[in-house]
Swiss-Prot record:
Binds 1 dipyrromethane group covalently. InterPro entries: HemC, Porphobilin_deaminase_cofac_BS, Porphobilin_deaminase_N, Porphobilinogen_deaminase_C, Porphobilinogen_deaminase_C_sf. Signal peptide: none annotated. It catalyses: 4 porphobilinogen + H2O = hydroxymethylbilane + 4 NH4(+). The modification S-(dipyrrolylmethanemethyl)cysteine is found at C242. GO terms for molecular function: hydroxymethylbilane synthase activity. One of its GO terms (cellular component) is cytoplasm. Its EC number is 2.5.1.61. PANTHER family: PORPHOBILINOGEN DEAMINASE. Pathway: Porphyrin-containing compound metabolism; protoporphyrin-IX biosynthesis; coproporphyrinogen-III from 5-aminolevulinate: step 2/4. Monomer. The gene is hemC. PROSITE patterns: PORPHOBILINOGEN_DEAM (PS00533). This is Porphobilinogen deaminase.
């Protein structure tokens, strides 16, 4: 078993390749006799760059091709950004490892202004996320939010070309790719609650491959997994994907988890908030509880309108 080859399915973006290389290095460090190779591939979400994610519709935009490689035996594991991973897995696959989380916050990036508060009225801000858009406009309704897709390098290039006064990106991606100096300020989770799983890397593999599960065990970070479990349970209860205005963030407080959740109108006119605390062993139940609080406040109507506009259930 120690001489086994592990084939990693990964997207081809710089950030996805960084994540796959990170997993490769961790595996080789834990198991020096292991041979680890990367299988880069293009996902549907990578091909459809001319429309907002919410308009494209469907879940698993960035993972389906990788899962197909696992099911067909072409790859042994798939490495994902946890915020892109759907709640449900194809039969025969599962999520067995969640690596330690990087900074989960959103980052404010601008060549002119140091923070969101410094932006003049009417400034153009780029983001592809309805979650970020809702929270930005709730705080600053005087801003113009403009569609922004593409990988990290592409988005930074568009900012540098003067298409935007500022852009909002995940801090984790910038840090991992060596662009930490481009972050003018990290936005507090109080002002921009992150997406579920943001900053965490997950490893998916075949459920029947028990030997592989054991090889992956040293990469698993229990605290991150507990937090992400609560966040994903909230998302699942709300039937959310990575392209809807749902935010959630859990932190550990001793022997308890504190989970905050949010559902927002994309125009920022309404933000529904809920939070809860529970023992660590009840992470999943906590996610459902906070989601139910949001549903009781009217979250379903907001999300139904978003899905209806996007043309998918």
């Amino acid at each position: 078993m120690s001489s086994r080859e592990i084939r990693i399915a990964t997207r081809q973006s710089a950030l996805a390749l960084w994540q796959a290389e990170y997993v490769k290095a961790r595996l080789e460090q834990a198991h020096p006799d292991l041979t680890v190779t990367l299988l880069p591939m293009t996902s549907r979400g990578d091909k459809l760059l001319d429309a907002p994610l919410a308009k494209i519709g469907g879940k698993g935009l960035f993972v389906k091709e990788l899962e197909t490689a696992l099911l067909e035996g072409a790859a042994d594991i798939a490495v994902h950004s946890m915020k892109d991973v759907p709640m449900d897995f194809p039969e025969g696959l599962g999520l067995y490892t969640i690596c330690e989380r990087e900074d989960p916050r959103d980052a404010f990036v601008s060549n002119t202004y140091a923070s969101l508060d410094q932006l003049p009225a009417g400034s153009v801000v780029g983001t592809s996320s309805l979650r970020r858009q809702a929270q930005l406009l709730a705080r600053r309704p005087d801003l113009q939010i403009r569609f922004l897709r593409g990988n990290v390098n592409t988005r930074l290039a568009k900012l540098d070309a003067g298409e935007y006064d500022a852009i909002i990106l995940a801090a984790a991606g910038l840090i991992r790719l060596g662009f930490e100096s481009r972050i003018r300020s990290s936005i507090s989770v109080d002002d921009s609650l992150p997406a579920g799983g943001q900053g965490a890397v997950g490893i998916e593999c075949r459920t029947a491959d028990a030997d592989l599960h054991a090889l992956l065990a040293p990469l698993h970070h229990a605290d991150t997994a507990l937090r992400v479990t609560a966040e994903r349970a909230l998302n699942k209860r709300l039937n959310g994907g990575c392209q809807v205005p749902i935010a959630c963030y859990a932190i550990r407080e001793g022997d308890q988890l504190w989970l905050r959740g949010l559902v927002g109108q994309p125009d920022g006119s309404q933000l529904l908030r809920a939070e809860g605390r529970a023992p660590l062993a009840q992470a999943e139940a906590l996610g459902v509880q906070v989601a139910d609080d949001l549903l009781a406040q009217g979250a379903e109507a907001i999300l139904a309108a978003v899905y209806g506009e996007a043309g998918h259930p």
